[in-house]
Amino acid sequence: MKTYAWILLTIFIFGCNQNTQSQNNKKHYVDLKTVADLQDYLAYKKGQKAIVSAHRGGPMPGYPENAIETFENALTYAPCIIELDVNKTADGKLILMHDDTLDRTTTGSGKVSEATWEQLQKLHLKDAEGTVTSFKIPTFEEVLNWGKTRAVMCIDIKKGIDPQEIVDMIHKTQAQKHSIIIVYNRPMLVKYHKIDPSLCISASASTVESVKETLALGVPSKNLIMFVGISEPQPEVYELLHQNGIKAILGTMHNLDNSALKKGEQVYQKLISNGADVLATDNVKLSASAISKMK
């Protein structure tokens, strides 16, 4: 009888441990079915919870930037928008890489544009401290397919890459429903919209005047989310965006993230109370925790 009781206790403890582990490893996936779903997800709605945007995918110790494994880790903290960087190899392969050179984030060296995809496949990614990981450089196509049932992706395209190439890959992978294109000027905004009027685009505007000028280009508000800079804009900027149903992304990387590290989660909570809808952050864990505690 004692033996039987011990077996039951062991099974119970094992089951509890497994349950705790699965809770700790829970993934906050966002599975959108249509472009209309993405437009609705990005639309400003009063009282809606703020969203974390994981800058460069949310790197942490052991998790290098622009790696699928890092994206998966970020999603254990919150249903993050995954911000990523697209670069291009010497032989025309679209890959994920922020820098123009390989030295900082990989075991390789030299320019990305001078390396072939075959050469890059032999490299490993390094985290921010320079620790070599087992993770490999992913292709843009691989990441678009990965994100289909997992996350909205905000795509930062390096200079020199033809917008048509980016859109063609999005179409090939049927990724319109979970892809946002980042642009840094109005001509590029218009260009992407002309290539595919259904695309959702992250434009930049940090003043009331620049918001008005962007809206005057004719891109529907439902296709837009607006990056307002790495410091807080005037309240009128948030008001104008929200009046047009557009969410505002505030970049907290650098100064605002550093302030939150020193002063605590209330820094993020204050930014959200002031009008920010999305926090583009290098500190996924802290910002996600701050948002989770807000009503």
Language-model-derived ranges and their functions:
Residues Y4-I13:
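Sec-dependent N-terminal signal peptides
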